[in-house]
Amino acid sequence: MEKYIIILVFILVAIAVTFATYNLSIIRSMPPEERYKLLYFKDNQVSIGIGLVRRTYKLKDIREVRFSKGKAFRSMGSWAGRMKICKINGKTSRWIEFDGTVYYKKMVYITNEEIIDKSINILMNEFRSRGIQCNKYR
């Protein structure tokens, strides 16, 4: 029984390493200015995120995008922005969190409320330029 548990642990570690390697290879292959983007628009579609966790939506299926902000979970006072895609058929995405990386275009560790507001405005302008309604709450 102990052998099977050890084998299972090694298999899970191998899967985690493969997942991390795949995501890092995607990020490394991108040009530097593209690595820290949250939204990727292409062929009337928007992709959110990078790698295996990327979600793609057709622009014509999006009714609105909702934005909010709040204190980041388990942080020492850092703020996070949140975005939710609402589709025409009534379904909504999960809340997608982002930080000051959207504004600074480089990795940041602590973000204040002002930078989150600027990041939300950047994302709202990207959606509005493509004719999608955006609302900011709180």
Task: Describe each region flagged by the PLM.
Residues 1-35:
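Alpha-helical transmembrane spans
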Residues 6-8, 12, 63, 89, ...:
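Residues marking helix boundaries in flexible regions
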Residues 33, 47-110, 138:
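Non-transmembrane, membrane-adjacent beta-strand/coil modules in membrane-associated proteins
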Residues 37-42:
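Short, exposed beta-strand/loop patches in secreted or surface proteins that constitute
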Residues 43, 52-54, 119:
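Intrinsically disordered, low-complexity boundary segments flanking structured domains
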Residues 44-46, 57-59, 126-132:
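Generic alpha-helical hydrophobic packing signal
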Residues 102-138:
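Cytosol-/stroma-facing membrane-proximal "stalk/adaptor" domains immediately downstream
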